[in-house]
Amino acid sequence: IIGPNGAGKSLFLRLCHGLLKPSVGSVRWLGAGTTNDLVSAQAMVFQRPVMLRRSVAANVDYALKLRGRTKTDRKEIINEVLGRCGLRRLQEQPARVLSYGEQQKLALARAWALNPEVLFLDEPTASLDPASTHAVEEIVKAIREAGTRIILTTHDLGQARRLGDEILFLHRGRLLERAETDKFFEAPENDLARAFVRGELLWWQLGRDNRRHEAQDKDPNNQ
């Protein structure tokens, strides 16, 4: 999901996840309504991960406890996901002393441990350096390859191309275009989407507003 600031990307994710209820309409997942069962089949990672005042391993363990997993299962899952996310050597470290990039990897590991059907990622690399961004993207790819559907918001068009199978372009709370990734970036159909991809959205909007004002000035009814 891409779009400029204020497009409604984060709001859209929260509605899909069930954190917010729509004032009109409904959210449906694979034909079913957003019930408690569906919510429990989902996980979400925010731009700024929330860490418990516990060790790295305990942060993952706590999430698994809430899902009712046995102690034996929890230990096995924790070892596996921390290893896949490159955090096994840090499992006894307090989570809050990790670097921001390591905390984001831990947030992904915690979500992955739940084996969700769908994982929502709200700009997970927005504040990361290039090396940490690459590491997080590799984890995201691994989670997707393991069978989890991923819905991700990003301002990084390169990241959208690297990770996305399908692109949704939002602007001011409206879905203006939806297309397969290659098709979207090669030939966006919507004017705003095309301007956004070219990095010209601000100038396009200013030009449109100027043309509108000029038309209003020429309208004799406005004299």
Kindly give the residue locations of the regions a language model identified:
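Helix-to-loop junction immediately C-terminal to a conserved catalytic motif
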Residues: 17
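Conserved ABC ATPase "signature" region
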Residues: 72-90
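Conserved ABC ATPase signature
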Residues: 94-98, 102
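Catalytic Walker B motif of ABC-type/P-loop ATPase nucleotide-binding domains
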Residues: 119-122
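Helix N-cap at the start of a conserved alpha-helix in ABC-type nucleotide-binding domains
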Residues: 130-132
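H-loop/switch region of ABC-family ATPase nucleotide-binding domains
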Residues: 154-155
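A short, surface-exposed alpha-helical micro-motif characterized by mixed small hydrophobic
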Residues: 160-162
